[in-house]
């Protein structure tokens, strides 16, 4: 809309670590662009390919990524953020959300020690932490795996303010659509 282009002619292809994203693009709640533009059939993403599929495609086409000359591109959303770098790790969504909440409620960036939320990152299938933002103590829980989520849902959840659940061990970085690169030692995660 801002570029004065017909949005129906734009095709959005997302490269994702997760095979579930292929099914998610058809979900009704994931068509905000269509709702905004009153185009019922429009989805936020038209196609999803996994990183594994992208690697396979590059190999099939004989592409050597190291020999490709960098070029300029139209950066619609900017270069990225620190939160974006950790988002695909177990605990990364939680940390990114807490960073944002801190900035909104406190009106400033959190101190460096606030970002050391090591208790919420890593490969344990359940982690908990408490943080203080704007004078309020917040209890958070990070889970991965449906078994851990099922156990959590059977408990009294009333003491928690925010819960993150990811299906894969370690988060999206270990998704089924990622290239096979062996197991990540727990100490390196």
Feature-to-residue mapping (PLM):
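Iron-sulfur-associated redox domains of electron-transfer enzymes in respiratory
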Residues: 1-189
């Amino acid at each position: 809309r801002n570029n004065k282009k017909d949005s129906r002619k734009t095709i959005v292809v997302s490269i994702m670590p997760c095979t579930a994203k292929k099914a998610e693009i058809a979900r009704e709640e994931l068509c905000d662009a269509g709702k905004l533009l009153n185009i019922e059939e429009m989805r936020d993403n038209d196609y999803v390919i996994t990183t594994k599929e992208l690697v396979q495609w590059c190999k099939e086409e004989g592409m050597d990524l190291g020999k490709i000359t960098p070029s300029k591109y139209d950066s619609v959303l900017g270069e990225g953020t620190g939160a974006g770098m950790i988002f695909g790790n177990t605990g990364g969504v939680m940390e990114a959300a807490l960073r944002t909440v801190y900035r909104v409620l406190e009106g400033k960036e959190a101190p460096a020690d606030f970002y050391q939320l090591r208790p919420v990152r890593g490969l344990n299938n359940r982690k908990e932490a408490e943080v203080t933002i704007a004078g309020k103590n917040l209890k958070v829980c990070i889970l991965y795996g449906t078994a851990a989520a099922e156990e959590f849902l059977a408990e009294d959840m009333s003491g928690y303010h925010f819960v993150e659940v990811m299906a894969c061990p370690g988060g999206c970085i270990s998704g089924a659509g990622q290239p096979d690169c062996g197991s990540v030692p727990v100490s390196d995660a």
